[in-house]
From Swiss-Prot:
Residue positions binding Mg(2+) 2: E271, N273
Tagged with keyword Nuclease: no
Organism classification: Bacteria, Pseudomonadati, Pseudomonadota, Gammaproteobacteria, Pasteurellales
Subcellular compartments: Cytoplasm
Catalytic activity: 2 D-alanine + ATP = D-alanyl-D-alanine + ADP + phosphate + H(+)
Name of the protein: D-alanine--D-alanine ligase
Family statement drawn from the similarity comment of this UniProt entry: Belongs to the D-alanine--D-alanine ligase family.
Comment on bound cofactor: Binds 2 magnesium or manganese ions per subunit.
Location, primary (coarse class): cytoplasm
Source organism of the structure: Mannheimia succiniciproducens (strain KCTC 0769BP / MBEL55E)
This protein's pathway: Cell wall biogenesis; peptidoglycan biosynthesis
Entry-linked InterPro entries: ATP-grasp, ATP_grasp_subdomain_1, D-Ala_lig_Van_CS, D_ala_D_ala, Dala_Dala_lig_C, Dala_Dala_lig_N, PreATP-grasp_dom_sf
One GO cellular component term noted in the UniProt record for this chain: cytosol
Binding site for ATP: 135-190
């Protein structure tokens, strides 16, 4: 096989999801990093370019930095498999599964891994929703979120029983399945995994009550601590848990797993990002930097792991 530097590489960026802007920023950073190191990399936006024709245009490999639906949900992965183009990140099944928070959590739960207690509501069952019963079981506050939307789109913190129905209705505008979860009041962190190696956790301290879209991409007041401070014992437990969560859903190459702690300090798995952000605010590069990866080295490593 030709060395990677001699291959024509498509950097897939942009796309049509709610996270298009973030993907364009990530893609630009990845493209620059590859070109700076002598790779023959080209920006390809599936919104404007038929990805199914990449191979006949001489492309030999794809760096997928599309975020959200269409890019992280198995769709683009299926197209690339179909035309036989190796690509970065997770395969079709894992991408499709992890885009669906509810089914990801059901799988983790089936393997005995810890998740938040939750109720599942769909468009078909929303009329049967009994807010009082839900609050009795899960307590207050509650977190309501669509099962399939990234970048914290459609999230609501519910502080009173009478707010629950509106929060569910809002989330249902983004997806037909909604999760109502117990509020996790502990520490929020995200843990990158690169080539089966668990990298240092990043603790997230948002200015507001939770890590929403603004805190993720716009605010400079969100604080990050990496490595996240914890005892050696907790660190070992976290690394083991994250590696198991990564393996259970079948991740490959690179992914980022979000974890929170409950009021008693117990870890709870939240979700998987199979195409983590690679912007100046992004957490994967922050973490990788603490173990010696420059941004450019990280990008090349991810490319080398493509399959």
């Amino acid at each position: 096989m030709k060395p990677l530097k001699e291959q024509k590489i498509a950097v897939l960026l942009g796309g049509t999801s709610a996270e298009r802007e973030v993907s364009l920023t990530s893609g630009d950073a990845v493209l620059t990093a590859l070109r700076n190191q002598g790779y023959d990399a080209h920006p390809i936006d599936p919104k404007e370019y038929p990805v199914a024709q990449l191979k006949e245009q001489g492309f030999e490999r794809a760096f997928n930095i599309l975020h959200g639906r269409g890019g992280e949900d198995g769709v683009i992965q299926g197209v690339l498999e179909q035309i036989g183009l190796p690509y970065t990140g997770c395969g079709v099944m894992t991408s499709a599964l992890t885009m669906d928070k509810m089914r990801t959590k059901m799988l983790w739960k089936g393997f005995g891994l810890p998740i938040a207690d939750m109720e599942i509501v769909t468009r078909d069952t929303v009329d049967e929703l009994n807010p009082l019963e839900v609050v009795e079981r899960l307590g207050l506050p509650l977190m309501v979120k669509p099962s399939r939307e990234g970048s914290s789109v459609g999230l609501t913190k519910v502080n009173a029983v009478e707010e629950l129905k509106n929060a569910v209705d809002l989330a249902l505008t983004h997806d037909d399945t909604v999760l109502i979860e117990e509020w996790l009041s502990g520490i929020e962190m995200t843990v990158p995994v690169l080539d089966d190696q668990v990298l240092p956790a990043v603790q997230i301290i948002p200015e507001g009550e939770f890590y929403d879209y603004d805190a993720k991409y716009i605010s400079d007041n969100t604080r990050y601590i990496c490595p996240a401070p914890m005892s050696e014992e907790s660190l070992q437990e976290l690394q083991k848990l994250v590696k198991r969560a990564y393996d259970v859903v079948g991740c490959r190459g690179w992914s980022r797993i979000d974890v929170m702690t409950d009021a008693n300090g117990n870890f709870r798995l939240v979700e998987v990002n199979t195409t983590p952000g690679m912007t100046s605010h992004s957490l994967f590069p922050k973490s990788a930097a603490t173990v010696g990866y420059s941004f450019e080295q990280l990008v090349v490593k991810i490319l080398e792991l493509s399959a």
